[in-house]
């Protein structure tokens, strides 16, 4: 604090030149203060002292609050400091809300967001609604999936907390799961059966519920759930999971062999439309990383459990990035390169495991790149091609060009390998029969054009050598490559919705049924569910 603030604080502590007394009604104790200081921080006091309120000229103002809480709040106005604890934080927020001290409310919200866990998140969710604390509300909701996956916690909730949870999770879990949670809660104590209709109406408002008694409705749902007549949509193996959309955030399953597709889930209310994000798949969970949300850059990482259809927030990236390249290696998710908030390419590398509380910085790339192809090969991360900036013309102007660099991450350092035969970005890479297969991609030539390609190269680490294999039927970039029943497929891409299968014996590609074009869904990213 500067000397002036120190002097004012000293006046406050000793009651010097004070012109107003704040009286705690709860304790009948008085705090002397200065109208000017109170008016600077509190809209409540400012309005009283600068309007025609009856209290304007009174020497005392009575506040229904605890004396100790009032004192540390008033002291904050003089010092800018306050000691917050788990025991006093909610009381401080309540009084600050009454006194309209926005600056301190923000500090309190930051503190309380750091003490959320499974034991208090429901209470704090209620608390956030009461005092319109949006960040606290979002943080509290992060823990709901952990609660509903823990039956011991669920069955101990009271009816009000159950209603709150159902209202929230019905947007992030399928109806089957919500019904099962309700049944498990009722079964724990027989007397809870009288709440069946009350709970079910928060899932949907179907009229037929009103004609049934609580017992009839309970038995009806129990029969469907426990006898397994109603269950999740089965997502069989060898489905492609396509994520994203221009207007609606869809999770869509598609099988190119049967040409069948269905929307597993959609989410646009809470998460908003996301673009330029990256997707990776690990242990039945899709991780949706970075990108833009409602047009703004985000560090957000979302997870979507395909089996139980639950959304969850994960620890954020350390940096705002979009169009980053991602892959899984040794149980860790890597996010490499991409673009920053200024649209410049970056060399940032971050990695994370689902059980970790934060992302960690890895060894940065040698130079900034984006649109690289990433692949896990022999438990090492390989980067192939991409875009980079380079001085290419007579005026020494930096241009964006395709790159032919190939590197692997070993012991947290990057090792340069044999260059890719052609400088490209948007290559699709996959490990198949102990080789890296690199398919298609595009060649960016400054001032000329962007050319999509259809050549296929394979790489072996044994001799660090690239070998031309064949050409696909359709030129494509940013396509999806995957293995179905030990056969290699390529699907879609930036400029096509075609599907091809590789014939290893003939070294040829056969075109199959095209991917359906979804009018409502522009596939920003894809992942394979195997």
UniProtKB/Swiss-Prot annotation:
Task: Tell whether Repeat is among the UniProt keywords.
Answer: yes
Please provide an example of a Pfam family that matches this protein in its UniProt record: Kelch_KLHDC2_KLHL20_DRC7
Where is the BTB domain positioned along the sequence?
Answer: 18-86
UniProt keyword Metal-binding present = no
Q: Which residues form the Kelch repeats?
A: 239-284, 285-331, 333-379, 381-434, 435-486, 487-529
* UniProt keyword annotations, A-Z: Kelch repeat, Repeat
What InterPro entries does UniProt report for this protein, alphabetically? BACK, BTB/POZ_dom, Gal_Oxase/kelch_b-propeller, Kelch-typ_b-propeller, Kelch_1, SKP1/BTB/POZ_sf, Vaccinia_A55R
PROSITE patterns, per database record: BTB
Query: What does the sequence similarity comment in the record state about its family?
Result: Belongs to the poxviruses Kelch family.
Q: What is this protein called?
A: Protein C4
From which organism does this entry originate?
Swinepox virus (strain Kasza)
């Amino acid at each position: 604090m500067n000397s002036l603030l120190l002097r004012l604080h000293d006046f406050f502590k000793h009651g010097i030149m004070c012109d107003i007394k704040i009286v705690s009604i709860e304790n009948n104790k008085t705090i002397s203060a200065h109208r000017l200081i109170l008016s600077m921080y509190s809209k409540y006091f400012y309005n009283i002292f600068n309007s025609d309120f009856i209290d304007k000229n009174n020497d005392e103002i009575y506040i229904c609050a605890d004396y100790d809480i009032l004192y540390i709040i008033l002291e904050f106005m003089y010092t800018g400091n306050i000691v917050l604890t788990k025991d006093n934080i909610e009381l401080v927020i309540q009084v600050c809300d009454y006194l309209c001290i926005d600056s301190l409310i923000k500090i309190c919200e930051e503190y309380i967001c750091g003490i959320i866990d499974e034991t208090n998140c429901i209470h704090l969710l209620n608390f956030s609604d009461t005092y319109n604390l949006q960040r606290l509300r979002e943080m509290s909701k992060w823990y709901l999936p952990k609660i509903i996956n823990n039956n011991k916690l669920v069955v101990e909730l009271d009816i009000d907390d159950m209603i709150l949870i159902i209202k929230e999770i019905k947007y992030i879990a399928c109806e089957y799961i919500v019904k099962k949670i309700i049944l498990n809660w009722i079964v724990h104590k027989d007397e809870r059966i009288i709440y069946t209709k009350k709970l079910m109406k928060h899932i949907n408002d179907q009229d037929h519920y009103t004609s049934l008694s609580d017992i009839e409705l309970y038995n009806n749902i129990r029969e469907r759930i426990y006898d397994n007549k109603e269950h999740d949509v089965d997502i069989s193996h060898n489905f492609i999971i396509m994520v994203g959309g221009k207007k609606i955030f869809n999770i869509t399953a598609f099988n190119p062999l049967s040409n069948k597709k269905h929307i597993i889930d959609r989410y646009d209310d809470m998460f908003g439309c996301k673009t330029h994000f990256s997707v990776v798949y690990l242990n039945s969970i899709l991780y949706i990383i970075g990108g833009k949300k409602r047009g703004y850059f985000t560090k957000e990482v979302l997870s979507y459990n395909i089996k139980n259809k639950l959304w969850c927030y994960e620890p954020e990236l350390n940096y705002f990035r979009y169009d980053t390249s991602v892959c899984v290696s040794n149980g860790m998710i890597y996010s490499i390169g991409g673009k920053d908030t200024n649209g410049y390419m970056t060399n940032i590398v971050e990695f994370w495991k689902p059980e970790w509380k934060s992302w960690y910085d890895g060894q940065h790339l040698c130079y900034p790149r984006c649109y690289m192809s990433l692949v896990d090969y022999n438990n090492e991360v390989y980067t192939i091609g991409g875009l980079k900036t380079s001085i290419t013309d007579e005026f020494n102007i930096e241009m964006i060009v395709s790159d032919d660099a190939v590197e692997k991450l070993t012991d947290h350092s990057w090792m340069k390998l044999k260059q890719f035969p052609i400088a490209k970005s948007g290559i699709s890479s996959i490990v198949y029969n102990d080789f890296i297969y690199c398919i298609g991609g595009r060649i960016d030539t400054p001032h000329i054009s962007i050319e999509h390609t259809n050549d296929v190269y394979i790489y072996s680490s044994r001799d660090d050598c690239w070998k031309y294999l064949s050409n696909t039927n359709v030129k494509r970039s940013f396509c999806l490559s995957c293995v179905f029943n030990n056969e290699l497929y390529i699907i879609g891409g930036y400029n096509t919705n075609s599907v091809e299968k590789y014939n290893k014996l003939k070294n040829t590609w056969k075109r199959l049924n095209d991917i359906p074009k979804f009018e409502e869904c522009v596939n920003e990213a894809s992942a394979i569910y195997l």
